[in-house]
Swiss-Prot record:
Alphabetized InterPro entries for the sequence: MTAP, Nucleoside_phosphorylase_d, Nucleoside_phosphorylase_sf, Purine_phosphorylase-2_CS
Keyword Lyase: no
EC number: 2.4.2.28
Superkingdom of origin: Eukaryota
Biological processes annotated in GO: L-methionine salvage from methylthioadenosine; purine ribonucleoside salvage
HAMAP family xrefs: MTAP
Keywords: Cytoplasm, Glycosyltransferase, Nucleus, Purine salvage, Transferase
Protein's recorded name: S-methyl-5'-thioadenosine phosphorylase
Family indicated by similarity: Belongs to the PNP/MTAP phosphorylase family. MTAP subfamily.
Main location: cytoplasm
Organism per entry: Candida albicans (strain WO-1) (Yeast)
Length: 344
């Protein structure tokens, strides 16, 4: 993302002020929920709850990989469809991108019965046509993380290789693309009619929209940003990995929706981005993200029954190690994700 001019204010405080809403006292919600929850939303910077839904439970889930970023809120639509929500960076955004407990996050959602995840993330734009406040539905990923983040549930003594040629779920991507009208649904359209939601089909001539995932927490140098553009990068963030890889291993359909806040540092013709600009874009993105999420939850409830089914059982046959050679403690650990796959 681009360079910031602070103008004497604290960025994190302004961001929190910009996304503040009157909230239900979640602490008073029940700490248990009976029944499966098939859809989850993971919120990124600027999206810390789903205000259009009705919270019914707040869960603290311990996994074989520790605790997730925070409590998971179960909410229902007006029709009664349940959705799990988890704030990736914690309720107070106190987790660095490299410190997000992604394995615990995905494992906890899997434990709830989640079959599909719609994840939101703020991004910097690497292309002129992807403007601040635009939304992007990426189809490919380039990994520029540094190996700091655990990116697999498997480990020495229990080896598996998940397919990742299509890092986002094609059926979930299509459901999202088909659900959002090309015009008029979200605020922020240009006068020339360019859609706010950039998809492979409607804005990129059928070419992939590629997200670069960098380690952070520092932003890119200008040279790095130009390199990513030369690779065909569309947007850049610090969050899509290992989240997408772990979702694939957990046999959960996954799609990220990116919310552009600014141009990355490649664009010298742009004025340095001020805090006020970023906060304004975050606020607009947050409102649009909530509207988009509400629409997609209804679409998933109506049409998403088959999404994720083609992934079920895939990891059972992705294991290279003979189960007879795996230590019992490793099998017990993986039983959290895959009960019944391997005899303990």
């Amino acid at each position: 993302m681009a360079k910031l001019v602070l103008k004497g204010n604290n960025l994190s405080k302004l961001i929190k002020m910009s996304v503040h809403r009157e909230k239900i006292d979640l602490a008073k919600l029940p700490h248990h929920y009976d029944g499966p929850v098939t859809l989850a939303v993971i919120g990124g910077t600027g999206l810390y709850d789903l205000p259009n839904l009705h919270p019914v439970a707040r869960l603290t889930i311990s996994t074989s990989w520790g605790f997730p970023s925070g409590s998971i809120t179960i909410s229902k639509t007006d029709s009664g469809f349940p959705v799990a929500f988890l704030a990736r960076h914690g309720a107070h955004h106190d987790l660095l991108p490299s410190d997000v407990p992604s394995r615990a996050n995905i494992a906890a959602l899997k434990k709830l019965g989640v079959k599909a995840i719609i994840a939101f993330s703020a991004v910097g734009s690497l292309q002129q046509e992807i403007k601040p406040r635009d939304f992007v539905l990426p189809t490919q990923i380039i990994d520029r993380t540094k190996g700091i983040r655990p990116s697999t549930f498997f480990e020495k003594g229990f080896v598996a290789h998940a397919m990742f040629g299509e890092p986002f779920d094609l059926k979930l991507n299509k459901l999202i693309s088909d659900a959002i009208p090309s015009k008029g649904f979200l605020e922020g359209f240009d006068t020339d009619g360019t859609p706010v939601l950039h998809t492979k089909e409607n804005t990129n001539n059928g070419e992939d929209l590629t997200i670069i995932c960098m380690e952070g927490p520092q932003f890119s140098t200008r040279a790095e940003s130009r390199l990513y553009r030369s690779w065909g990068g569309s947007v850049i963030n610090m969050s899509v990995l290992p989240e997408a890889k772990l979702a694939r291993e957990a046999e959960i359909a996954y799609q990220m929706i990116c919310m552009s806040t600014d141009y990355d540092s490649w664009n010298e013709s742009e004025e340095p981005v001020t805090v006020e600009t970023v906060v304004g874009n975050l606020k607009a993105n947050s409102a649009n993200a909530c509207k988009l999420a509400a629409k997609l939850i209804d679409e998933f409830a109506a049409k998403g029954g088959e999404i994720g089914k083609d992934l079920q059982g895939s990891m059972k046959y992705a294991v290279s190690t003979s189960p007879h050679g795996v230590k019992k403690e490793l099998l017990e650990k993986m039983h959290f994700l895959f009960p019944g796959y391997w005899e303990v």
